[in-house]
Every structure is written in C-alpha cells, then in structure tokens.
C-alpha cells in the first residue's frame, strides 16, 4: 500500500470537505458507448437489439420489386478484422476500418395465378461484401486517411410537440397568438397557429395556411364529432312551457343562477345571480334535483351540439352548429320537441375559437378536405381522390416517410398525457396464440366490447363469435396486450355507436386479418343508418388498424392530432403552459452512433432505389443477391460523413486536456442544427437546466459563443439522447448515499439541495431551512421537503473548468478564458504537475488515453525507454492467452498539432503493478497527473515598463533550465510518381549539386537520421524527367561528356521550407508491391523485425519461466517411480530417490515429461498438461509474430500512379523567447516582453531571484482573484517543501520527519499509510515533497483564507504572502513589500516562431501584381492608408515612393531595380503601379472612357 503511494504520487493535501460519493464516469464514455450501441459488434447475432446499424438494415429491408414477385430480405451483418492496426493506419495514411459482410436472402414468389395462393418458388441466401465501416480506437477517435478525427456530438431540438406564443409581436394589437409545432425525427412538420381573429389554422411543411378543421375533416371526423370532442354540451328540457337544463357539475361551477333554484320542497338552495359552488351543486344532487330552471335569454344565441329532429316527420329543425334564435325556439316548442343539446361556450373559460374555425371552413366532407390539402401541397397538379388520399397517407402515416422516433413519441405522450406505448407493435409471425389465450378468446372479446356506450346486444354477440373465430386464424408473433385490446374496444364502440364505417379503398391496400373485414361488414350492415341523414365514412380510423394490426407507433395518428388541437385550445383558454425551447428536456444529444446511423440510412435508401430498378429490369430468378447489391452508395455516404461533415473534426491534440474536451464537446451547429448567423441570444444563454449537465463556463469566445458547449464532469447521456446528471436521494430530511441519474424533465418539480448543504454524521440536514433549487429557481425550503441533493460541487462545471483552483474567486469571463487556454498549453520537455491543483489532474490524465495503463495485475519484468514487459499474476492467466503483457511505448511521434507525443516509463523492474495503474507517462503528464505548465516563482510588481499591458518579464534561468522548452515535430512527404515522360526517381545522384548539399543523404537519396537541417537543405533527393527540348550547344557538349543522364532530368528534391530548423528523427519509406526495395527500406524493415523478434523472445521466455516454476512445484520433493536418464542415456537419478531442484536444472525441459513419479496422484498428467499448454502458447505467439513479419515485408498499397513515398520527420526544439504567449489558469494571459539575465531579476533576502514578474494592475479590473489565492497557497506549499528539504539536509530523525508530514497533511487515511512506511519509502516520499507539498483545492470547496494563512505561518512566511524584494541591478530593496508566490504558468501554442517570417521577393497576386499576404503564401507586409500617412508625416518621400511602387506592384520598375542592383547603379526609376491599370480597366468596364495620355503636354 505504502509503496503504491510513494510510487504513484497520491500525495495531494486535499481541502475538500465533502466526501466522494460517486466516481466521475469515464470522461470519453459518451463517444465509446454511443458507437458500441451503434455497431453491437460484440453482441451475438441473434441477441442484437433493434438499434443502431441493425435498426437501419431492418427498416430498409425487405426490398421488393415493383410487381412484388421477389423480395430481398436482411438476415444479419458481421464485421471482420481490420486490415491494418491503428499505428499502421497512421503511418500509411489509411482509414482504420473493418470490412463488413451482410447476409441477405433473396426470396422469389410463385405468382399462384392458377391456385390463387402465393407460394415461395426459390430462396437464395448469401453473404455480400458491404464496404468498410470505420472503427473507433480505444480513445474514442477515428483514423481517417491517416489522421485522427473526432465526431462531435450534436445538441439539437428533440422531436415531439412544442407549444409556443409570439409574445404579442406579430399583430399590431399586441394580442398573444398561440401556436403548436409537431417536429418529427424525419418527415413533414405540422404547425397549428391562431390568427388575431382567433381562428385556428394549420400549415403542413410551412406551406400556405388553411383552417385546422380541414385537416381534422380529412382525418374522417364529422362536424358533430369535432364539436362534441372539444366542447361540453348542456341538455335543455322544454316541459309545460318552462325551460330547464340538466345539471352538469363541471359546467355549473362556471355559471350563476338565473332565477332562484329550489328543491322539491321549495327550499331555496341557490339564490338568483349567485354563483354555483361545489357545495351547492352537491346539495342539489343530494336533494334529488336533476334539472334547474333557466331563461330563454340565457339560451338564445347559443349553438346546437347535434341535429334537432322533428319527432313526427323526422325533419331537421335545428342543424348541428346552428345558432338558436327566438324564432327557432318557438318552432321547437310548436313541434313539441321536449329535449335538445346546446354547446357550452361562455367566452371566458371556454372560447368559441374552434366553433368559429368550423364556421370559417367552407369544406363539408372528408373527400373535399383531402383534395384541398393536395391543392395546398401540390399547387398546379390536378387532384384526384386517389392521389390525394395517397399523398395524405404518406405525409404522417407512412413509417418510411414519417418517423417520430421513440424520443418523439415519448415527448408527445409526456406533453399530452397520451397512452400509446412505444413497445406495442405486434408483428406477424409463425407463432400462434397460446392455447390458454385461445380458451380465453370468448371472454377476451366479451370484455373487449363491454363499452361505455349502448350497443345492440345481438350485434355484439355476432361480433364476438366472429372475432373469436378469426382470432384463431391470426398468426400473431406475440399475444395481444390487454391495454391494446382495451384501446381497440373503445374504438369499436365508438365506431358502432356512431355508425361510422371503414371504406373499402383504404382497406384494399392493407393485408388485414379476415376478422377486421368481417367486422366492417357487420358494422356497415348493423342497421344504424336509419336515424342518420348521411353516413360520414370514417376513412381515417387509422388508430384501430395501427394499434391492433401493429404498425409503428412512431408515426403520427389521429388521436395525437386531436389532442394537440385540444391542448392548443386549452392554452388559448388560459390553461396549460408553453414550452421553453432552450430547456434541456427539449434539446437532445445526437452522438457519433446516431449521426452515423442517419448517414447509413441515407446510403441504404439510395441503394434501395438501384436494387428495385435492377430487380425489375433483369430476370431475378437467374440472379444471386450479390448481383443486385452494389454497396458503393453506402460507402460513399459514410466516407463523406467522416471526411467532410461539419461535425467530423480534426482532433485537437495539443495536450491531453484538449483531446478529452474535444470528445466531450456538444455543438448546436452542423447539419440539422443552427447556423451562427441565425442563432439568437436565448439559444446561446445559460439555462437553469444546464446545472450539472452542460458547463456554464467553457464555451468559445467569438461568433460561436454559447453554441458550442462542454459536458459537465458527472453528466452522461441516456438512451434517448437526453443529458442526465446524478443526485443523491433524500428521504425525510435524511441524505442517503444512493445515487440516481435524472434528465432535465425528470428533475422538474423536485427540490434539490446544494452539495455543500450542512449535514450531520447521520446525513440529516442541520438547518431547518435549506437553500435549494426547484424548477429553475433558488428557494429556501424546509428540510423535510428536500428530495434530492447534488453529489459534488464540481458537478456544475466541465473538466477544463474543474482544473482551475479557486475558480469560485474568478470572474466568469476570465474563468472562460482560463478553461479555454488550458487546452492550448504546449506539452513541455519536462512535465511538472501543479503544486496547487484540484484533484482532477489524475482523472484527466488517465481517461485521456495518453498515458499507459496496466491491463492486469503483475510484476514488471523488463523496462527500457521504448517498452515495458509485465509478467501477469497467475490468477489472471485465464483471461489472456499468454501470461505476458508487452507495452510498446510511443516515442517522439507527431500529433495533429505538430506537438510531440512521447511516453516515458514510471515503473522499474520488480515493481508490482495493479490493473489500472499508470505505468508510463505521456505528453503533459507527470507521475500519472496532468501537467500542462510549470510551477514558477512569480512577483506582482511593475518592472521598467516591461510588464505594461499584460507583458511578462521572464528570467533567463527558465530558458537555461529548459523549463519552457517544447519539441515540435514536422512531417515532410516526398512522392515519386509515374509521369507521362517517365518515372520519377528517388536518388542521391542529383545533377548540378555539390558535395556539401548531398553530404547527409544516404545512397538511396534519403537524409540520415540525426542530421541537423536548416531552410533549403535537401531531405529527399528526387529527379523528374524533363520534356524533350531543342538542345543548346553547351547542353550538347554536356551530353557528349556525361551521357544521357545530365540533360533530361530536373531536380525536384524535397527541401526544408523557410523558418524550420531542427533534427531529423525518422524516415519511413513506402514502396509499391513488386518494386525492388532500396537499401534504406531494407534497413528500416530489419530494425522493425528485430523489435518484433525481441517481443516474441520475451513473451516465450516469460511463459517458459512460468511453466518451469509450475513444473518444479509439481515435481520437486516427489519420489522417482523409475530411473531418470539424460538425453545421452546416462542415469541421473535412481528409482525411489527424491527429485531435487538441481536435478531438474541439469535436464532439458522436454525430458521432464518422461519423469514418472511414484507418490502423488496424477502428477504425470499435470506435468504433461502444463507442457502441452506451454507448447500451444509458444506456437500461438510464433504464429502471431510470423504474420506481423510477413506483413512488414509485403509491399504497400499506394495511391494510383505513385511508385514510392518517403516521409521524413524533423524535430524542432522551441525555447521560450520574446513574443511567445503565456498564461495562468485564471484567464491571465500575456506575451513575453523581455528575457532578463538571472542576476538582474528582483531577488529575496536569501538571494533567491524570482522567475517571472507580472503586472499587479492586471488583477483588479479583471476580477480574477483566484490567481492571487493560488499564488499564496503555492507559496505555502513551496515553503513547506523547503522545510522538508532542510530537515533532510540536517538528517532529522525519522519520527520528527513523519510528525511534520503528518501535521502538514492532517488526514487520517494518509496517516495510516505513513505509519506503515519503512525508512526507504519515507525518504522517497520526503524527497518528492521537498519540491513542494502538492495541494488539491477542488472547485467550490477549496481552501479558505484562514486555511491559507495557517499554512503560510506553518511554512514560516508572513500571512499576507508579501516579501521584501531587492533590485537585481542595484541591490537596493524596493520601497514596498511585494506579493511573491508560486503560480502555475503555461506556454500556449501561439508561438512567435510560427508567426514571424521574412520576405525580400516572393509570389505576386495575378491581377494586382501586389505581393501575397501571410506566412503560408510567403507573403509581404501590407502597407495601408494609415501607414502612408505616418510616412508622409515623417517626410520620407523617397522611402514611400519605393514602398508604393517597386516594392509593391510596379512590374517594370521591379525588373529595372534588379538590373540596377546587379550593375551596381544605386538609382531608382519608378514606373506605373499595376493597380492604376486595374483601376482604369474597372472604370472602362463601367462604360466610362478613361485613358492615360502620356506626352509633354
């Protein structure tokens, strides 16, 4: 235990007060889990869920031809092993991908014209190659064409229904207009909106609007049905001339009594003009009152909710939705109508908007409505009923065209309170209903038809028996769920009671069970039409078909649309709430898997069209599946997605933090998302639901602010794509350690306490009132009302922000800069983990994948700079094939940002390692912790103006000690192609070049490793054939002397570009298969092969040793059952003697198998078993390594036309210099202004100089006080380290040393470990602590002021952290004391070397003839209008003339100047700038006749 502490640097003094409840989930799980779900590659074929790739195949297949005589069905897919591993893909510029094979089945049907029954004629099954699919590496990235890329997760609007209003901005009256929008995952959008006259309109796909009732009528609803669906009605009785109305308790509470209302005894219960209350209504009902008197005034002007019919003649007296006038009332009295129904609309609680919409809608029947919709969507096409029906059906009810998705259905049901379950699809299949269910069929159907409405019993019986018979014929895959049958019951009842029936044309297209056809016949013939004026066909009763027959519930259905309209009307009436689009319950994350799934679907749909055409054109019977399938469209779509999608990004590999953050990024941009220009303020803003899900701090500055966010530390994404955050459950004021994840919707309405709320030992809240969050507000609630509690204070922020100590003391804007700048820190030569950290450093380093983590428990067997060999513990043997783990470390490899990736071992031979331990550090990691910068002694004081405006004064000591030196690796590539004129050749034999230029090239023309190179040096010599030209006499002479070679080739060697100076650290040669290898290639191959052989030998050796140990344990001490001979036949041990260790050592291992033992059971069998297993393992290892060697010797796959490709890697050492950008972790950034000699820096009274001087004025206005607290705490940490150093120098006793360390840490767990340490371990720990005691000050629970002061005192410093400094130049003390301390300072990727460049001549722009701009174009420095004024002000007329003519765009002047310099004349003859000619041409193009007249006049 102690050893692992000393070894693994677990020594941070932590200031956290809240104990760790739950570990932070793996930081890159968002990527890995998503892709794992998508591929399901490790799931057996028959257990794969219908998600990801599997779901795409199942949704597109089966593919039928147009005549439906054949169909292509999907069976399964399998992935093979990738051709190249990750490392090879990097080097060769390949994509890391696995070949995919899909098993498909081609079924050919017999048309069955004679028999009338369709039968299967032929079935062919085959595996078809389906292109390659990129695989994710262990670190959550993809390798596409040799570069590492990340697919960023997209944050988009969730499918579902959204209700909103225009905030009164649309109409001049300022009236609030409500609207609803149904957004599917894919398919047509449906919008409902009110206009200022309160008429409800609908738009399909944002086309022209029409009354919403047109859509409802097209769904097959009658006017009467709709009115009664959205409005309640009151029954009016006419008895003996008196008007009375029935008691409807719901409606009465909204009304006043017109006259006194009395019971049968005449006791007045409600007086006139008084409101009805719940109590008074209950009293009326208790007294047996069923109707109350009303006046004719109160009912005149209201509308009929159903047709009122003359009881004698059957004539309609009052139509549905017709207004009741005084004349009509009199007519009803005359015709002796006793009762009729009126709609209840009071204009306050129930508005007439829907009734007005019905009135405004001039369409009377369902058919007209369908045709009207067709006209709106396809203006110009002549509509027919059939085409209108087909179009409407495809809009919302066809699963191929319209997909709400499981999430959309979930959101819709959640919002509208519907009960359509995402899992209630019943598929046709071979299995029958179970016997028990068949017995219950009668009973089932009886219960099915027990409805609320009256039904003819005879009809019910007929229906029942018929349904039972046909249920027996139904071949349902699974039993019909109860809830489904209940739903079917309601539908059937309403169908029977309203005498609505299905029309045949709808059914014809569907293969319905017989029972439904029979049902419809019965309903149609049920004799219910005698009392109806007309039967309105219920064309769209899709719900019944859908739920009973098992279509996808991920389509829209009639009920949804009715309910959406109902909710919208309720909103209008002041009930319900609108949705907040920025709420994280309304936004969801599409991670890699889902993004790729969508692309794959696009590709498969394209492929489907092609297959259908092929099936129709060719004779299918003679074809196999592979003749029909061409997977090119699918591969092309996938390739395009990974190569050029907006969300597929070049991985930011500057340092481990930038990698992790890039993989955890959430972007609102991208296809199907927002655009920068359109996104307003609200979308970008922080929302209460972001708490614990999305970081409020980390987002880019600039146009993308708020659109790109980062996942919070503990957040994860659930299967629906919503971001979840963990909370501890609280029961009756008691905090439990049970943790549950909540999405933003689930957390709504809960009272959530902060993580730092005070609790006692038992987890009960100490304070009576606790500060909590509830529905996005901060509230004080009683402790018993708290339901949840945060798990940790850092739950709020992202990984980068959680790495900033004292974040709580920084202004948010600066914290944002701090978290963004940490991602730009360059990995330094010597990583140094921060003295003041937050405790997150280890987690980031481990999850980023840059350091090497032990895969098993074991013992380190061998270590060198390039590899670690670990012998695995025996109890872990079964998992791995062999007992050895070999870790080949990455050495000086180039990252995407040209920084250096280098791994260094941190273990030594004999160390015990546990699974999950860090055994090698990567870039920017120090003993398994993230280390982006250096701990520097800083002083806050002005110094000679060198820290004006955030400049930084740096001591030369830092460059001398290479504290800020970084290595950058550039890759240069040279390609030899086969040209029309002949082959290019890579060679050292280059014409017209001296010995000096070629001194570092080997005979193959490639530079040697270790060569120092500067701009213009040749890296790879290459010659290209020249076209045949007329030869000059000189060339003819050269040809005659030197033969052909010199004349017909030109030098096209790869040279170093300007601004690059470094050391060659590697070269790789790739040659086409079949070409002869040059000496360099053979050398490289030999080195690689030696490495492989060494690995092989180590594995075999360790396995042999392990087997030898096992055999010795079996044999030593046993009695020989027969004499033992060596291979020469000499007896080495007589029978009956004990076997010893020495004896076994004298024999070869294969002779051990021949030893027979007299005591101990089955020893010989065990020995044989161990030896046979050993031989198997050795064979296996040798096989694997032979394959690798074969692969190495094979030629390479190069692009067409390429013969050979050489890559050269140059390492550039960048020291810190003036102009480099540096920053702290608190957004305090600056540029190095001067590197001052060590002796001139301000120094302390003990002679120690400070290393960096910062401007104190950079703190107050920026409000990032965190940097000051960090400086103080760092100073205390360093001071304590110096004290320990002093104790070590003075050889203090072990006890005193332990005591000091124990008091410093003040941690019970650490004290236990300290007590178990022996002297050696203690000294190791003390030596490490002497550099400074590392502290962890986690965000929002960091060290307080009192704690820092206490530590400063303990370290022997003043509590204000200030020191007297002396001027290094004069030795005088500065007047005031200065704040000095340790700050963690980073060097950022904006290096001056990458920006500075010089040009004298270079490329010019084609049109203006002015020099190009920028370093990449080797351009010049622009001299603008204001610079010209400055030159004029100085009076530098000649210099200015030169700038504006010969140095810019005076073409003839340039050549004259060149000639003048060559001839030694120093005169300037400027000509006419080219831009003048351009101006003239521009004016001429505007038809202005402008010309320049030259001459004397």
From Swiss-Prot:
GO terms for biological process: DNA-templated transcription. The keyword Transferase applies. GO terms for cellular component: DNA-directed RNA polymerase complex. Keywords: DNA-directed RNA polymerase, Nucleotidyltransferase, Transcription, Transferase. PROSITE patterns: RNA_POL_BETA (PS01166). It catalyses: RNA(n) + a ribonucleoside 5'-triphosphate = RNA(n+1) + diphosphate. Disulfide bonds: none annotated. Its EC number is 2.7.7.6. GO terms for molecular function: DNA binding; DNA-directed RNA polymerase activity; ribonucleoside binding. The keyword Metal-binding does not apply. It comes from the Bacteria. The RNAP catalytic core consists of 2 alpha, 1 beta, 1 beta' and 1 omega subunit. When a sigma factor is associated with the core the holoenzyme is formed, which can initiate transcription. NCBIfam families: PRK00405.1 (NF001616), rpoB (TIGR02013). Belongs to the RNA polymerase beta chain family. DNA-dependent RNA polymerase catalyzes the transcription of DNA into RNA using the four ribonucleoside triphosphates as substrates. This is DNA-directed RNA polymerase subunit beta.
